[in-house]
A protein has these predicted regions:
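Sec-dependent bacterial lipoprotein signal peptides
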Residues: 1-17
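Activation on beta-sandwich/Ig-like modules and their edge loops
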Residues: 19-174
């Protein structure tokens, strides 16, 4: 029994020491909803020149994340969340420490990052679901919004959401 215990302790010691400091330090928050604009009249154009509502995702990990195959919705317990196409990984992959803007315009013909859900200025939820359609990757329920003023995470405290008079889609919040 004593030999078994020593063997077990040695195995644990090997496993713990085999994890490099870098492996432990790369534990980020992963994929997060970082900023959004629920009433875009004249702030930020998409590549087609349209002023559409948008949600910005941020990859806080050290690995690329492809959101293709994940689901997006604005309604908790939505039985028909929008499936983000997996056919264009060049468009749907977020590089490490990178940003990606999803346009909420119900105009999927404009590309993989244009979803069938629109955001309500009056307030609602933003929910990103994993490929199993059940696991919430990140979500935020927001209050009533002001036109052309975005809401996003405070860079000094990611748990705090604040308003931005100068929205920054695809860039760090300021």
């Amino acid at each position: 029994m004593k030999d078994y215990l020593y063997g077990f302790l040695i195995l644990i010691l090997i496993l713990v020491t085999s994890c490099s400091e870098e492996d432990l330090s790369t534990e980020g928050r992963g994929l997060i909803i970082n900023e959004f604009l629920a009433s875009n009249d004249s702030c930020c154009k998409d590549s087609n020149g349209d002023y559409d509502d948008w949600v910005e995702l941020y990859n806080d990990s050290n690995q690329p994340i492809d959101i293709g195959g994940m689901y997006f919705t604005d309604t908790p317990n939505d039985d028909k969340p929008y499936l983000i196409p997996s056919s264009d990984p060049n468009s749907t992959t977020i590089q490490p420490k990178g940003y990606l803007v999803i346009w909420c315009d119900d105009d999927q013909e404009q590309g993989a990052l244009h979803v069938s859900k629109k955001l309500s200025k009056g307030g609602e939820s933003i929910i990103l679901l994993s490929q199993d359609k059940l696991t919430i990757v990140d979500s935020y329920t927001f209050p009533e919004q002001t036109t052309d003023i975005s809401m996003g995470r405070d860079q000094n405290d990611f748990t705090n959401w604040i308003f931005f008079e100068n929205p920054t889609p695809g860039l760090p919040n300021n």
